[in-house]
Regions:
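Secondary-structure edge/capping motif, primarily at the C-terminal ends of alpha-helices
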Residues: 50-54, 109, 142, 146
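Glycine-rich, aromatic-bearing surface loops/beta-hairpins
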Residues: 139-179
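Sec-dependent N-terminal signal peptides
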Residues: 3-12
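Extended amphipathic alpha-helical interaction segments
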Residues: 107-142
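Immediate post-signal-peptide N-terminus of mature secreted/exported proteins
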Residues: 20-61
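Amphipathic alpha-helical segments within well-ordered protein domains
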Residues: 47, 71-75
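Mid-length scaffold segments of soluble, non-membrane domains
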Residues: 76-114
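Boundary at the C-terminal end of the N-terminal hydrophobic targeting segment
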Residues: 14-18
Length: 179
């Protein structure tokens, strides 16, 4: 129940505060960006747990397994493996980068969370899976003509506004348009 409430809180915050892109299809774009932000916010919990447990951020086997599972789920809804990879390879990289930045900051004296770390297996990973499946559907539903440099730049601004670095924002928003 605690995990579900955490997920609802993160989602509500992301959707309530996601500014409109002002572009054609903006509702779909806003939902996609809000889900990207939610996934990144969950990465903060992952980072805190890994920091407290002295676990390395990079877990290439886990990342490969996630991508394989998402490709399988993507096929079920009509996406190609390339379409799934186009969205999720950058999302996984952005998550990893956000975790690395947070952990480096904590090691060098940035304020640390005051809450105890959550259980990676039982609490955090189910949230990552849930939001990733939502992202898959939103990616499928997004009209291809919505992808543009303007959309990508707007998404970067929204991600930065949620407290992520320009580097994380650039990586996470990269599938949304050329640039």
């Amino acid at each position: 129940m605690r995990t579900f409430l955490l997920f609802l809180l993160i989602c509500a915050e992301s959707f309530a505060q996601a500014p409109s892109t002002g572009l054609q299809g903006s509702v779909q774009q806003d939902h996609l960006v809000a889900s990207i932000v939610t996934r990144l916010q969950i990465s903060r919990e992952v980072a805190w747990t890994k920091f407290q447990n002295h676990t390395p951020v990079a877990d290439l086997a886990r990342e490969a397994a996630i991508l394989t599972a998402l490709k399988s789920e993507g096929r079920k809804i009509g996406l190609t493996e390339d379409q799934v990879s186009a969205l999720f390879v950058p999302q996984i990289a952005a998550s990893r980068r956000a975790q690395e930045e947070l952990i480096a900051g904590w090691r060098f004296g940035s304020p640390r969370p005051t809450t105890p770390p959550k259980d990676l297996q039982r609490e955090i990973r189910p949230l990552v899976t849930k939001i990733s499946l939502e992202l898959l559907q939103e990616w499928k539903d997004l009209p291809p003509q919505s992808l543009s440099t303007t959309f990508r730049k707007d998404a970067e601004k929204q991600i930065i506004a949620k407290g992520f670095s320009p580097d994380v924002a650039r990586i996470a928003a990269s599938p949304l348009g050329k640039g």
